[in-house]
Amino acid sequence: MAVQQKIRIKLKSYDHSLVDKWAVKIIDVVKQTDAIIFGPIPLPTKSHVYTVNRSPHVDKKSREQFSFSSHKRLIEIMNPTGKTIDMLMKLELPSGVDVEIKS
């Protein structure tokens, strides 16, 4: 039985529409090379909340909360070819999307 190669691409951003848009673009590029694709798989959204004092030295009871969420998607590519990898390397992702690639 042959060992299957796979590439896992994790996209992470604070804007969910940006992550979804680029996940679709990556899938379209990979479909042109006849590789098998699983995804985009939505991973859990992490919400971060920061609480700060409104005043620099008085009124400890007066606070303000700031929150933001980080959205993640996973794309798995099975049996990638050299052409698949070349096309993925040519993609120019925006600065708002963090990409992590594992093989």
UniProtKB/Swiss-Prot annotation:
Involved in the binding of tRNA to the ribosomes. Part of the 30S ribosomal subunit. This is Small ribosomal subunit protein uS10. Signal peptide: none annotated. It comes from the Bacteria. One of its GO terms (cellular component) is ribosome. One of its GO terms (biological process) is translation. Belongs to the universal ribosomal protein uS10 family. Keywords: Ribonucleoprotein, Ribosomal protein. GO terms for molecular function: structural constituent of ribosome; tRNA binding. InterPro entries: Ribosomal_uS10 (IPR001848), Ribosomal_uS10_CS (IPR018268), Ribosomal_uS10_dom (IPR027486), Ribosomal_uS10_dom_sf (IPR036838). Pfam families: Ribosomal_S10 (PF00338).
